[in-house]
């Protein structure tokens, strides 16, 4: 009896590992328009150029980072977002860099009216379109770290 229980136990254990692995079926997370650039940024909130990030509702744009820049937004001093400024529904081109009037990022390409919330990166009117590409962001004291 002991010898039949051991293989059964291992089979159950292996099956539970296999079925517990999640699969992300949302095709919007596999955006063919944007690459994953290497991002590793530290922001010191004591520096004047990042002072706005000490207050909820404010944002700072990091030019020269990511693909077309990164917008960092203070949601509530505990939650920050860092999002790519290249419109996720266009391959990067001359007009794909979005402009920001918090809390909205707008694509200036004349062919559409893509607008996104910088609070969560979602398209303002069409949730079937790709959302803005997020970066990991962590605040520790007066330091904000942005990575991917």
Located regions from the model:
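Alpha-helical transmembrane segments
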Residues: 11-15
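Short, highly charge-biased, low-complexity peptide segments
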Residues: 124-130
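C-terminal motif of bacterial Sec signal peptides marking the signal peptidase cleavage site
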Residues: 17-20
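Bacterial N-terminal signal peptides that target proteins for export
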Residues: 1-9
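Short metal-binding segments enriched for Cys and/or His
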Residues: 115-123
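Short cysteine-rich clusters marking metal-coordination/redox-active sites
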Residues: 87, 107-109
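N-terminal pre-ligand scaffold of iron-sulfur
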Residues: 24-102, 117-118, 133-148
């Amino acid at each position: 009896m002991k010898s039949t229980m051991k293989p059964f136990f291992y089979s159950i254990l292996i099956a539970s590992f296999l079925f517990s692995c999640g699969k992300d079926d949302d095709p919007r997370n596999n955006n063919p328009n944007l690459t994953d650039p290497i991002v590793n940024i530290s922001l010191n909130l004591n520096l004047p150029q990042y002072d706005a990030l000490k207050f909820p509702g404010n944002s700072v744009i990091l030019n020269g980072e990511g693909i077309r820049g990164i917008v960092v937004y203070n949601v509530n001093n505990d939650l920050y977002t860092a999002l790519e400024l290249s419109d996720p529904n266009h391959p990067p081109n001359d007009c794909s860099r979005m402009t920001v009037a918090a809390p909205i990022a707008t694509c200036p390409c004349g062919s559409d009216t893509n607008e996104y919330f910088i609070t969560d990166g979602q398209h303002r009117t069409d949730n079937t379109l790709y959302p803005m590409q997020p970066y990991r962001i962590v605040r520790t004291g007066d330091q904000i770290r942005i990575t991917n």
